[in-house]
Amino acid sequence: MYKKIDGSKSFVQMEREVLDFWNKNNIVDKSFALNEEGEYFTFYDGPPTANGKPHVGHVLTRVIKDLIPRYKVMKGYKVLRKAGWDTHGLPVELEIEKKLGISGKEEIEKFGVEEFIKECKDSVFTYSSMWKDMSEKLAFWVDMENPYVTYHNDYIESVWWALKQLWNKELLYKGHKVIPYCPRCGTALSSHEVAQGYKDVKEATAFVKFKVKGEENKYILAWTTTPWTLPSNVALAINKNFDYVEVKNNDEVLILAKELVDSVIDGEYEIIKEFKGEDILGLQYEQLLPFYTPEEEAFRVIHGDFVTLSDGTGIVHTAPAYGEDDNIVCKKHGLPMINLVDKEGKFIDCVEPWKGMPVKKADSKIIEYMDEKGILYKSEKFTHSYPHCWRCDTALLYYPTDSWFVRMTSLRDKLLENNNKVNWYPDNIRTGRFGKFLENVIDWGISRDRYWGTPLPIWECECGHRECIGSISELKEKGIDVPEDIELHKPYIDKVKLKCSKCGKEMKRTREVIDCWFDSGSMPFAQHHYPFENKEVFEKTFPAQFISEAVDQTRGWFYTLTAISTAIFDTNPFENCIVLGHVLDKHGLKMSKSKGNVVDPFDVLDSAGADASRWHFYTASAPWLPTRFSPEDVEETQRKFLSTLWNVYSFYVLYADIDKFNPLEYKDFVSENVMDKWIVSKLNSLIKDVEDHMDSYRITQAALAIEDFVDELSNWYVRRNRSRFWSEELREDKIGAYVTLYKVLTTVSLIAAPFVPFITEEIYNNLVRGLDKNALESIHLCNWPKYDENLIQKELEREMDEAYKIVKLGRSARNSVNIKNRQPLSSMLVSIKTLPEYYGRIIKDELNIKDIIFGADLSSYVEFNIKPNLPVLGKAYGRYIPQIRKEITSMDQMKLAQKIKQGEKVIINIDGNEIELNEENLLVTMKGLEGFAFAGEGNIGVVLNTTITDELKEEGQLREILSKIQNMRKEKEFEVADRIKLYVSGNRMLESVVEKFEDIIRKETIAEEVIYNEEREYVDCKINGEDFKIEVEAIK
């Protein structure tokens, strides 16, 4: 009836067989085709770059992004699962530069832009097979046969349409600003790109003396972390409201903020004058490094709101060419800009000592030069966060350049309004990391002076007229001799000229391409080639109900999606977003090649399998928290959950196959067994709870609810009901056990199917398809199970849960005194009020005790030790510790311990101070007195009587003997139904135990005969420390 389970087969082998089944039967495509008439549920797949290898972080994103759509398909929704590839931008260009052995724009131009573009296009899918392989092994089901690709003409055309909308709304403009600039890549970067590349660096800073004009030995003391900007200084900024002083130090008079004198001035000093900052506004000084002197008036003290007293001297050197704040304040005061750095980040010729030198490398040389000239007060190393290029890792410069911008500052309020409509997981992202970024939003520098990207569709005429093109048809309509099959990339698009509608001359396209993040942020509409095609599909699937990516994307994709959607559609682009934490190594450290702690996801998939990897990420921690990931972690997950589920499934198949039991013949059978009713109630509660969690994106809670249920199914239901399956005749009680376990296994497989798609498919194919060839072909084509409120009995669940909890506490108490469960004990006391007798029998049987007393006062049997947790309580109330100890000692120790363990507040009053005692600031230990063992949790405590009489000792020996015999049957690979002969010898005392309990032994081990002291080979055993010889033999 059922396919026999191969115990030697690994989960990985099973998963490969399931993959073959899916591929041969087109199960993935059939899943995509489900629910054609259903309501749409949309999720967006943030596009990875296929010219980079996938890593463990991508395993996390894929298993989260796969789970929700699977669940929604089972719930009847039509889910579009379109894969995408992010193909433009610096990441691709840098890889090609490496491949070709060239570096920088000049060498690209020499190589040839057309050939360079071809190389970029050919490279973008370098690792696509690796991505597809990982996705298939993980069962990440997205349509990879028809993906959206950001370099395709259709996609670019939709992006052009979006840019035209911005143009029409006057949100796209050209400006000359000081913005972040990568000298290595030769292009400006946007604020969200900059936010992804900050690093803590330790660099030399300079305290510099600017000589006051017309004064001897009087200097204004300023501090800078970027000495290379000093040749371009035009002003010194102070805060007019701060207190400043003149300080005499080493025969020089230095001006600086009063509050910072002690931290800055070395040696002895004398304050000779105090004044407000406003008193020195306009004070002139001599140019510090006069390599280039501007014609305009400069070199004076001005007010700047950005000046603080947190570090430095309270006086800020200001170079408007290299700082946004500097640029704004200097423009306000009519000061000139001195730019002495070229676009490669090197000093120009007039800076004679360092001409042609990269500016960051010149810092130390400039400090040495100033020291020689006597204008350096001192230099110190300083650690600060400095932006680096997010792709090539070069330190960025703030640099004046022409660039195209999207006017995001005008949309700030709308961005915040749309952000507030999103359900963020975790919720603090809304007002924290993402919300703060939006509050401080600046205009988006969208243009890149590079090659491989979506060309900015703006044409300019020398008369000053500009035109933005929003489609290929518009390009052909307005362009001159546009090829029919026009390729929209550089250099082909640059050959297209437009006729100026103002003066009639030829218009040329501006040379820039756009930020590749604009490409990915356009995917909600561009993936459908909207508005040129699929208008209805886009309108039905926008905004998305769900997206999920790593926390870094709060500065990346989450932002660009929000920015573009707000600017064009005036709404939020997604409704629910799970923000994923970082994946760490087994020690909780960030993975890096330099540390040698990088885990290869393919190694883990090949050793432990996809289901285990998926389940680990669902249960190890909330998705937004950092997660440790290692082969050992995944293997532990496999053992704890998958193996438990598999063992229950194997148990059912083994016995159902022996009995040729077909549950389809008992569809209407209703079991009256209490355990069956309990597990069915728990099953229906599980469906309801998991559904509630999943509808609210509480993935970890949903997965842990399933894990807890499977644990109870295995370690409580099956454990308590094994004898029902072992009984020889197929009576009602056995039928009830089979019907119940079958129902539970098939239903829990449906519930777990979105989480662990492989093992659930295997179980479904054997238990459901194996019996009914008309059943749906795959579990992943099935609907989500419906719960039945009439089958949920909360009182029954509470009672059984309490019984199970008492059993677990009883086991814990036994362990605390090293008494095995096979050794019977006389009695157990339980603190809670009585449970129905049925549960008492279960507890006694499980714990191997003779008697149980409910509602007992345990205080006479337990020793309590309650004392302050000094590192916590001492820190807050150190001087009161002796009084606190005294107060604790005077209280009822058991009641105090119970309150603390149950999380109740306990307030004591010491010298008028109310002090709360809790589990954090108290150390509570409880143990049984001599002859007793104690364990407690929450409101339940248990005490075992550990005195063992001779009669109890004999029963314990019986249990040990039975265990040894059953293990020998397994080792000899006897079938469950095989009858045996039992031979014992070598210990008269233990032989008498066998004689006394022979009937029980024969029944439990299916022994036809027990033979004593026969001459033969035996297995030497230890029974509670006693030597004994046992042998078993199958009866042919």
Curated annotation (Swiss-Prot):
InterPro entries: aa-tRNA-synth_I_CS, aa-tRNA-synth_Ia, Anticodon_Ile_ABEc, Ile-tRNA-ligase, Ile-tRNA-ligase_type2, M/V/L/I-tRNA-synth_anticd-bd, Rossmann-like_a/b/a_fold, tRNAsynth_Ia_anticodon-bd. Its cofactor is Zn(2+). A motif ('HIGH' region) lies at residues 48-58. The keyword Nucleotide-binding applies. One of its GO terms (biological process) is isoleucyl-tRNA aminoacylation. Its main location: cytoplasm. The keyword Protein biosynthesis applies. It is found in: Cytoplasm. It catalyses: tRNA(Ile) + L-isoleucine + ATP = L-isoleucyl-tRNA(Ile) + AMP + diphosphate. GO terms for cellular component: cytoplasm. ATP binds at K593. Its EC number is 6.1.1.5. One of its GO terms (molecular function) is tRNA binding. Signal peptide: none annotated. Catalyzes the attachment of isoleucine to tRNA(Ile). As IleRS can inadvertently accommodate and process structurally similar amino acids such as valine, to avoid such errors it has two additional distinct tRNA(Ile)-dependent editing activities. One activity is designated as 'pretransfer' editing and involves the hydrolysis of activated Val-AMP. The other activity is designated 'posttransfer' editing and involves deacylation of mischarged Val-tRNA(Ile). Monomer. NCBIfam families: ileS. This is Isoleucine--tRNA ligase.
